[in-house]
Design a protein with these regions (language model features):
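Hydrophobic beta-strand residues of extracellular immunoglobulin-like
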Residues: 63-66, 132, 168
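Canonical helix-turn-helix DNA-binding module
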Residues: 60, 142-143
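Active-site-proximal glycine-rich helix-loop-beta segment
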Residues: 149
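Acetyl-CoA-dependent GNAT
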Residues: 3-6, 10-16, 20-34, 39-106, ...
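Conserved beta-strand-loop-alpha-helix junction that forms the acyl-donor binding cleft
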Residues: 132-142, 159-164
Length: 177
């Protein structure tokens, strides 16, 4: 088996383009398994544009954690660490906005390491929980988070160009840093 050495760092404004490209790749691999429809293409190019990531990378309430192999980006986690209410009553904490890992780099420890770093970051900012929304059609993601201690606390809907996608709201209580 080839060696798979990973390095981790905090994202910077100069990473916006590679984060955007990886995001489009992962988004379409996840949602467009039956082909790329216009609604998904529009969402990919609007929500995951370099400009949108550049804006988010400069927000003080967000941190991007990157995982690389050499100089190539394999994945990232976007954490919003200001207090945030989950879209289900009674739950709040830091939000894991997204954790994206290239399909060919999955199941090699990158996602697990990014998630652990995201949890540490949330605790550093005083959060007692980390929550996220995962598409209910993504069995791999739901299994990944359940295996790592995330509880399903409810459901929310995300709308892409008039089409609704159900999301499971997952939450993990965090201990002290």
């Amino acid at each position: 088996m080839p060696e798979f050495h990973l390095s981790f760092r905090v994202g910077q404004l100069s990473d916006a383009e590679t984060i955007a490209a990886l995001s489009v790749q992962v988004f379409l691999a996840t949602y467009a398994s039956d082909g790329v429809r216009p609604d998904l293409a529009n969402e990919a190019f609007a929500e995951y544009s370099t400009r949108r990531f550049a804006e988010r990378l400069t927000e003080s309430a967000r941190t991007f954690l990157l995982v690389e192999k050499g100089t190539g980006l394999l994945g990232f986690a976007e954490v919003r660490h200001e207090p945030s209410s989950a879209p289900v009553a009674g739950h709040s904490g830091s939000e894991l906005v997204r954790l994206y890992v290239q399909p060919q780099a999955q199941m090699q420890g990158a996602g697990r390491a990014l998630l652990a770093q995201s949890e540490r970051l949330a605790r550093t900012y005083g959060a007692n929980a980390l929550w996220l929304a995962a598409w209910e059609g993504n069995a791999n993601a739901l299994g990944f988070y359940a295996h790592l201690g995330y509880a399903d606390v409810g459901r929310a809907t995300y709308v892409i160009q008039g089409q609704s996608f159900g999301n499971r709201i997952l939450l993990k209580r965090l201990g002290s840093p």
